[in-house]
Amino acid sequence: ICTAYDMPHHGIFGKLDDVKRIRDAAPNTHLMSAAPEKSYATADEAVRAAYKLLSIGCDSFYTNNSSSIIRSLRKEKVPVISHVGLIPGHVNWIGGFRAIGKNAKEAIEVLEHALELDDAGAIGLEVEVVPPKVAEIITKKVKLLTISMGSGSGCDGQYLFSQDILGYNTGHVPRH
């Protein structure tokens, strides 16, 4: 899976050329992308954003929105990849960047969230900065593809940033 992720500083239209270039360079690779965070508030807006990305070559649409929006996307046959654990857009709600699921209450909440997204019809799930044992349990309990981002090797796949792989990261190196 190759990701052309949301780049709020470019907006969705600045990213469309990137999606097209990635698709041209990797025609047989699953390509996932997202609309910029908070660029859609309703299910109809999410479907519109997803169709725009699918129309230029994406294979699936990433969203960390609610299961109701995911259900609406799936009703319209949009393949959805969602997110549990540390969700960067929610860091101010949880006291900053930190591992999620280190205590029993949070671990159960992360698992329940994963099961809810699975039930909503997501085809994949990014599991970010969750203890490896919790990520393994999630992977065993859900039907969808799990992708670890700093959550150990117990998921179906590993999410890596090109900046990290190529050594472009300066300063603090995140856990993922």
Give the ranges of each region predicted by the language model:
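C-terminal alpha-helical cap/extension of soluble enzyme domains
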Residues: 40-43, 56-57, 130-133, 144-176
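Generic beta-sheet signal
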Residues: 34, 80-83, 147-150
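Conserved anion-binding
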Residues: 30, 38-120, 155-156
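Short, acidic/turn-prone active-site loops that include or flank metal/cofactor-
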Residues: 5-8, 85-87, 151-154
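Glycine-rich, proline-tolerant flexible connector loops at the mouths of alpha/beta enzymes
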Residues: 1-26, 37, 58-73, 122-137
